[in-house]
Amino acid sequence: MNALVAATTGLSLGISADAIRTGLAGYSGIENRFTVVDAGGVRVVKDYISHPTGMRRVLAAAKTLSNGPITAVFKPYRFTMIHYLGDEYAVAFKDADRVVITELYTAGEVPIPGVNAPWLCDMIRNNGTPVDFIPEMDDIVGHLESLLPSVSDASGDTPQVIFFGGDDLFRLADGLIERLGSA
């Protein structure tokens, strides 16, 4: 639908159909929105989304790609967002087999008493999804590697690790890809 609107707009501005066709053919999508890399028998996905509705949709889409286990990795963003959308986050991970959460990115906000990453972990866990709280970002890739042999042995389908967040989590995803690729 977006391509149709872009093409129509281009034509109305006098851009040739051939130029539009070439442009659309070369478009590979938005970087870090469901960016998929297969490495070492694991599908690693990077997605910039941090709103629970979008995360729920990404996980539902990932579930259609493989019957293998899904591990979601999330760095919560802002006290206010986690506080006001806590109930939505609690159910957003229902299609994940496991969630790994690290410390909250505060974006300079004043803390809200009782609202923190362990609180969010409890909310998700209370909705039936296993959660691991890994406060140190440097420990996440090793933790994921320790999970993957057991989850990949559990089924014949490709396990998926989905990183939700921003640049620091994407660097972790790249580190996991590098380590899996050499495994």
Located regions from the model:
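Nucleotide phosphate-binding/pyrophosphate-handling subdomain across enzymes
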Residues: 1-98
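Thr-Gly-centered strand-to-loop micro-motif
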Residues: 45-46, 108, 134, 163-164
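Residues at alpha-helix caps and immediate loop-helix transition turns in enzyme cores, especially N-
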Residues: 54-58, 84-85, 112-116, 172-175
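Short glycine-rich anion-binding loops that position phosphate/pyrophosphate groups of nucleotides
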Residues: 76-79, 104-107, 166-169
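C-terminal helical cap/extension that packs against the catalytic core
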Residues: 90-156
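Short, flexible loop segments at boundaries between secondary-structure elements
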Residues: 101-104, 179-183
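A glycine-rich beta-strand to alpha-helix segment
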Residues: 140-179
